[in-house]
């Protein structure tokens, strides 16, 4: 809860402390944090391949972020700015708007931020502004948890929690000591407090300290630099998963070859091109002309009863995709209509309710709608629905159209040919193509070619397939709207899904068949889908005359139904290095942090959540390729890591 001092300065009732100086909060920010870290002078030396990262403890009203954004706009050289902030008690849109309204020069920035400040979830929330020049990762939760999950290194640190006397937990020695794990030699910090306990903790963590004149009535403030060279840990214990340790690229990445121009490859091409990378996009069939070419796809989070990798990833992917598409997609490419998921044998009422409760989700994300709720009463069609979960901002997309728009960017060259063979030449990769005499040379190669990833990559490893990606058939149908179906407001999900009518057409999908590789539509699948919709929603009055078209496609699915995103190891070296890592006697033995194959990455196994996963997945992989802070927790990077399948082989 907030109170207001003189109706202008926000005061936290929880901590009985002000969020910023009543004298002039914006000038205080500029003096203590922007000036305290010497940002204007340092930024003159940044370039597009060296993004600048700021870590902030205490997002509060967002004033420091807005002021930093404003300062960034003064720079002629628009490098990428990563701003990572931690906030345990986030303010509402209304509270932030009122607090920052005291500074009219920030109005435009504030409004752009607030347009994306929604659908928030515990943990990391990722935002992009200024066409990808500014990246904000907002961690909602405890600062101790946040510092364990940040995977990048900061160039500057803003320590801006409430006063140590008011909020001692944020200033504990264990918290400030962990700053060394997110710092590099020369990382600066600044803070308004010069409390002895803070000085001692920062000094012990390896920071040199300097007192400077404070702002306004504060006589002094504190700045400093991380003066240690972080020792490169070359070995780790088995429980630390040594194969997951991040390492920066060995050389500067300027070019990338992406194999596969479906939704995964197209979104990755977009993310890399926005970072100044020249992209060669290889696909014999063109852009999204295989499974990604379905007429419409639907997206909402997949909730498990207990928070785990799948639900945590899909929640983050959903809110980022929603934010990205809301500003990127054209009206006929994307529709935020809400998605209602009815009860099924797998998702019973207890599981649904517990999922929402255990993930601490607000109604912006998901809410349980029992029979007789306002959701059912307020719409004539909804009265016929059973109880279930409403994902208020569930959405549909036209994947093919979105993919083509992603690729229609400067710096992306589409080559319609088949990848044939690979060769490492110096620090680059050469790709030979079928159906083309063109030789492609790039700093990195990324496999995004769906269920063919394992087969194509195996040519690098003497025919050994290291990615167990299965080909799973699905069929959907397009239906002409009926008088009744034209009034359906939401996506309807249960055993199958039905989109609302768009331009007189519904999409009903999808079947799931792991053992049939027939690429042609089958009448029995069309009949199955029709029978489902007629039984589930009889008042919509669909019949066989409503069928406009049928389409089959093949999902690329991993055994754990989780994407593969990250670098690639040599399987033989991995086996030899870690073959005894799981033996009980080696529990306390350290193993080498194995180096990945330089410039080789994979992005696939998205299964039935291709659209949902692609946008955030592309940002994750772009950050790994270029050595940037990742937009998700380190624990999620571990779960997504391609080497998990090599490790499971060893355990067998």
Curated annotation (Swiss-Prot):
Keywords: Cytoplasm, FAD, Flavoprotein, Methyltransferase, Multifunctional enzyme, Oxidoreductase, S-adenosyl-L-methionine, Transferase, tRNA processing. The keyword rRNA-binding does not apply. SUPFAM superfamilies: FAD-linked reductases, C-terminal domain, FAD/NAD(P)-binding domain. It catalyses: 5-aminomethyl-2-thiouridine(34) in tRNA + S-adenosyl-L-methionine = 5-methylaminomethyl-2-thiouridine(34) in tRNA + S-adenosyl-L-homocysteine + H(+). HAMAP family: MnmC (MF_01102). NCBIfam families: MnmC_Cterm, PRK01747.1-2, tRNA_MNMC2. This is tRNA 5-methylaminomethyl-2-thiouridine biosynthesis bifunctional protein MnmC. It comes from Leptospira borgpetersenii serovar Hardjo-bovis (strain JB197).
């Amino acid at each position: 809860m907030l109170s207001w001092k003189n109706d202008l300065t926000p005061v936290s009732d929880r901590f009985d402390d002000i969020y910023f100086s009543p004298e002039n909060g914006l000038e205080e920010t500029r003096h203590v944090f922007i000036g305290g870290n010497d940002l204007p002078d340092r930024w003159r030396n940044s370039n597009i391949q060296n993004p600048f990262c700021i870590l902030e403890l205490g997002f509060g009203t967002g004033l420091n972020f807005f002021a930093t954004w404003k300062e960034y706009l003064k720079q002629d050289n628009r490098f990428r700015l990563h701003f990572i902030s931690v906030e345990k008690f986030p303010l509402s849109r209304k509270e932030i708007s009122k607090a920052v309204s005291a500074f009219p020069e920030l109005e435009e920035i504030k409004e752009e931020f607030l347009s994306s400040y929604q659908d928030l979830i515990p943990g990391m929330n990722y935002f992009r502004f200024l066409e990808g020049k500014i990246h904000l990762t907002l961690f909602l939760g405890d600062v101790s948890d946040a510092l364990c999950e940040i995977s990048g290194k900061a160039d500057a640190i803003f320590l801006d929690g409430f006063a140590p006397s008011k909020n001692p937990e944020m200033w504990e020695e264990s918290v400030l000591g962990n700053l060394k794990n997110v710092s590099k030699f020369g990382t600066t910090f600044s803070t308004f407090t010069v409390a002895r306990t803070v000085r001692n903790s920062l000094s012990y963590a390896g920071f040199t300290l300097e007192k400077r004149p404070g702002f306004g009535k504060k006589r002094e403030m504190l700045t400093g630099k991380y003066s240690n060279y972080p020792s490169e840990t070359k070995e780790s214990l088995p429980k630390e998963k040594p194969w997951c340790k991040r390492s920066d690229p060995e050389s500067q990445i300027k070019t990338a070859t992406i194999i596969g121009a479906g939704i995964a490859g197209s979104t990755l091409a977009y993310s890399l091109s926005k970072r100044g990378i020249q992209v060669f996009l290889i696909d014999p069939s063109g852009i999204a002309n295989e499974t990604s070419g379905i007429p419409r796809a639907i997206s909402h989070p997949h909730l498990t009863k207990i928070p785990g990798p799948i639900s945590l990833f899909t929640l983050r992917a959903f809110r980022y995709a929603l934010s990205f598409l809301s500003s990127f997609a054209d009206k006929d490419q994307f529709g935020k209509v809400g998605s209602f998921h009815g009860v099924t044998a797998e998702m019973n009422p207890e599981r649904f309710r517990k999922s929402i409760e255990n993930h601490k989700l607000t109604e912006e994300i998901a809410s349980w709608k029992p029979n007789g709720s306002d959701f059912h009463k307020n719409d004539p069609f909804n009265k016929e629905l059973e109880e279930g979960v409403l994902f208020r901002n569930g959405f549909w997309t036209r994947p093919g159209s979105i993919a083509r728009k992603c690729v229609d960017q400067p710096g992306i060259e589409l080559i319609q040919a088949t990848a044939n063979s690979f060769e490492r030449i110096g620090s680059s990769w050469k790709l030979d193509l079928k159906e083309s005499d063109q030789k492609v040379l790039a700093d990195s190669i990324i496999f995004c070619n769906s269920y063919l990833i394992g087969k194509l990559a195996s040519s690098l490893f003497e025919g050994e397939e290291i990615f167990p990606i299965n080909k799973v058939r699905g069929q959907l149908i397009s239906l002409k709207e009926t008088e009744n179906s034209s009034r359906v407001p939401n996506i309807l999900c249960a055993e199958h899904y039905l989109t609302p009518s768009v331009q007189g057409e519904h999409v009903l999908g999808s079947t799931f068949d792991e053992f049939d590789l027939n690429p042609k539509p089958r009448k029995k699948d069309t009949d199955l889908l029709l029978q489902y919709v007629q039984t589930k929603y009889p008042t919509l009055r669909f019949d066989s005359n409503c069928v406009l078209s049928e389409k089959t496609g093949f999902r690329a699915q991993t055994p754990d139904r989780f994407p593969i995103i990250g670098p690639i190891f040599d399987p033989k070296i991995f086996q030899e290095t870690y073959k005894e890592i799981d033996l009980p006697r080696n529990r306390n033995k350290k193993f080498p942090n194995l180096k990945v194959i330089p410039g080789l990455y994979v992005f696939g196994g998205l299964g039935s959540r291709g659209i949902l996963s692609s946008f955030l997945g592309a940002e994750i992989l772009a950050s790994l390729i270029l050595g940037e802070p990742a937009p998700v927790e380190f624990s999620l990077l571990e779960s997504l890591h391609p080497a998990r399948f090599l490790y499971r082989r060893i355990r067998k």
